[in-house]
Curated annotation (Swiss-Prot):
Function: Catalyzes the NADPH-dependent reduction of 7-cyano-7-deazaguanine (preQ0) to 7-aminomethyl-7-deazaguanine (preQ1).
InterPro entries, A to Z: GTP-CH-I_C/QueF, NADPH_dep_7-cyano-7-deazaG_red, QueF, QueF_type1
Natural source organism: Bacteroides thetaiotaomicron (strain ATCC 29148 / DSM 2079 / JCM 5827 / CCUG 10774 / NCTC 10582 / VPI-5482 / E50)
Gene Ontology molecular-function annotations: preQ1 synthase activity
Annotated protein name in UniProt: NADPH-dependent 7-cyano-7-deazaguanine reductase
Cited PANTHER family: NADPH-DEPENDENT 7-CYANO-7-DEAZAGUANINE REDUCTASE
Catalysed transformations (reactions): 7-aminomethyl-7-carbaguanine + 2 NADP(+) = 7-cyano-7-deazaguanine + 2 NADPH + 3 H(+)
One Pfam family of this chain: QueF
Compartments where found: Cytoplasm
Species classification: Bacteria, Pseudomonadati, Bacteroidota, Bacteroidia, Bacteroidales
Active site as annotated: C51, D58
GO cellular component terms given for this protein: cytosol
UniProt-listed GO biological process terms: queuosine biosynthetic process; tRNA modification
SUPFAM superfamilies: Tetrahydrobiopterin biosynthesis enzymes-like
Length: 151
């Protein structure tokens, strides 16, 4: 297992904020307990993006929950990644799916779900939800069950 400080380039260093969508800032580190199934949850209450049509800002709380396997996302890199959506034009549903797919690519988790709780615009709230369970495992069935039993 590589030294933790060798795996991470952002933590403990001066922060450079990207001005547009930047999945390359995401960093992962080794899970010290890959034999255990356990949840990791991030609540990101200050997410912003832009409406791709009007350019108006959209505000949301993004909730990310996952069951790690070998890799885990480093929280400062996640913060910078989410911040990179600030000037990015995407619909709410796109943001949630993009975030989930980027995290799957980074970590290959056993299971992940991402929820966006967007502030109402025009009197309508949008709460997109996306999830993934690793194919061929109990987590695939878990993902289907959680998706089909959402409110």
């Amino acid at each position: 297992m590589a030294e933790l400080k060798d795996q991470l380039s952002l933590l403990g260093r001066k922060t450079e904020y990207k001005q547009d969508y930047a999945p390359e800032v995401l960093e992962a580190f080794d899970n010290k307990h890959p034999e255990n199934d356990y949840w990791v949850r991030f609540n990101c209450p200050e997410f912003t993006s832009l409406c791709p049509i009007t350019g108006q800002p959209d505000f949301a709380e993004i909730r990310i929950s996952y069951i790690p396997d070998i890799k885990m996302v480093e929280s400062k890199s996640l913060k910078l990644y989410l911040f990179s959506f600030r000037n990015h034009g995407a619909f709410h549903e796109d943001c949630v799916n993009i975030i989930m797919k980027d995290l799957i690519k980074l970590m290959n988790p056993k299971y992940i779900e991402v929820t966006g709780i967007f502030t109402p615009r025009g009197g309508i709230s949008i709460y997109p939800y996306a999830n993934y369970g690793r194919p061929g495992t109990k987590f695939e069935q878990m993902a289907e069950h959680r998706l089909m039993n959402r409110e």
